[in-house]
Amino acid sequence: MPAKAASAAASKKNSAPKSAVSKKVAKKGAPAAAAKPTKVVKVTKRKAYTRPQFRRPHTYRRPATVKPSSNVSAIKNKWDAFRIIRYPLTTDKAMKKIEENNTLTFIVDSRANKTEIKKAIRKLYQVKTVKVNTLIRPDGLKKAYIRLSASYDALDTANKMGLV
């Protein structure tokens, strides 16, 4: 402890004459030397984190720029009537529906809805449909029962398709 006190006293003695010398120079010399700019360092107070987990603060994220694709070609619509209607069913139950209920039975794409199925049948076989019933079979395929209007015969349409 006494060593620290002695060094502090020595530094006070040394600093006093320097300040006195600098005051004399400032009085005699140019006033520009006295008005020397001092460098100011600003210290911002940091927030103390009181939570046990550190959460990174949000920083600026530049919005993404859309890059033009190098392969600029016309996108082809792969969802057409031939993709929607896969194939007709020729089981005994399907044949009975053709004869008694004027209904055709098809396996269709599992993502197709009833209106798309109706439009595809109209395009492929040129017949009007009254309604479309669909079900998903246990094997994952979608079956569609297409009831034709009274002006069209399901048996004639099946003959044109080559079912009967």
From Swiss-Prot:
GO MF, one annotated term: rRNA binding
Keywords on record: Ribonucleoprotein, Ribosomal protein, RNA-binding, rRNA-binding
Domain of life (superkingdom): Eukaryota
Region (Disordered): 1-41
One CC-aspect GO term: ribosome
Keyword Transmembrane: no
GO biological process: translation
Function of the molecule: This protein binds to a specific region on the 26S rRNA.
Family annotation (HAMAP family): Ribosomal_uL23_A (MF_01369_A), Ribosomal_uL23_B (MF_01369_B)
Family the UniProt entry places it in: Belongs to the universal ribosomal protein uL23 family.
Annotated PANTHER family: 60S RIBOSOMAL PROTEIN L23A
Name the UniProt record assigns to this protein: Large ribosomal subunit protein uL23
